[in-house]
């Protein structure tokens, strides 16, 4: 089913205010923090990136993701449309094959790994919403030899509020 998502950046001062607010409002920890590693795919023109920056819909993100540095990877497509966002996810066994050959997408053509993002994610639940908070965000550029090279460490935090696509306001 489609869902709504609101994402925003927080600096250290705003982070403290945000954490105080969600605790005061009764948000509860959903489960333990996890390290999230995502490898994002795009075509040579970086069309998915540009569509995202420009807010074009429909659009999608294609990524491989794993948690806590285990060897189990998920292949995900996240579609944004007028109705909201929708994600498909399936376990993959041929990690190296997808990294080397890429993924042929009907909308964007051949997509290869472009960037790896790694961060520590905290999870909360509040009313019918799920809140995630990402910190220690590191970006790595994917190289032609399929390795990743450190590119940037983000000093900010990213919070996201996710809920079912209903009339209930965030």
Where are these regions (language model features)?
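Phosphate-end processing signature that detects enzymes handling 5′-triphosphorylated RNA
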Residues: 1-170
